[in-house]
């Protein structure tokens, strides 16, 4: 999952720093992630994992780091399996 998120981030994140040099816990907004790029990132993640972000998870915290994105995707996938 981490590798897939990193690939999507590299494609849509428009970051000035190479994604492979960014730590899982690093602040993506401090690394240069814009609000526009975060929307593109979200759409890429939704497509890759066949999920839809619920309104309550559409926030800066969900996309703050690679780890945060991974945790959010896992939360959505767990909820999807339970449904």
From Swiss-Prot:
Modifications made to the protein after synthesis: 4'-phosphopantetheine is transferred from CoA to a specific serine of the apo-form of this carrier protein.
This protein's UniProt keywords: Phosphopantetheine, Phosphoprotein
All copies of domain Carrier, residue ranges: 1-80
Residues recorded with modification O-(pantetheine 4'-phosphoryl)serine: 35
UniProt xrefs under SUPFAM superfamilies: ACP-like
Keyword check for Phosphoprotein: yes
InterPro entries, per database record: ACP-like_sf, PP-bd_ACP
Pfam family, any one: PP-binding
PROSITE patterns membership: CARRIER
Task performed by this protein: Aminoacyl carrier protein. Can be charged with L-alanine, L-glycine or L-serine, via the formation of a thioester bond between the amino acid and the 4'-phosphopantetheinyl prosthetic group, catalyzed by the Atu2573 ligase.
Annotated protein name in UniProt: Aminoacyl carrier protein
Species annotation: Agrobacterium fabrum (strain C58 / ATCC 33970)
Organismal lineage: Bacteria, Pseudomonadati, Pseudomonadota, Alphaproteobacteria, Hyphomicrobiales
């Amino acid at each position: 999952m981490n590798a897939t998120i990193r690939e999507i981030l590299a494609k849509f994140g428009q970051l000035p720093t190479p994604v492979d040099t960014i730590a899982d816990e690093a602040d993506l907004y401090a690394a240069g992630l814009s609000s526009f790029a975060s929307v593109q990132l979200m759409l890429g993640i939704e497509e890759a994992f066949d999920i839809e972000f619920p309104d309550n998870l559409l926030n800066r915290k969900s996309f703050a780091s690679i780890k945060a994105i991974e945790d959010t995707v896992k939360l959505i996938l767990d909820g999807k399996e339970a449904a």
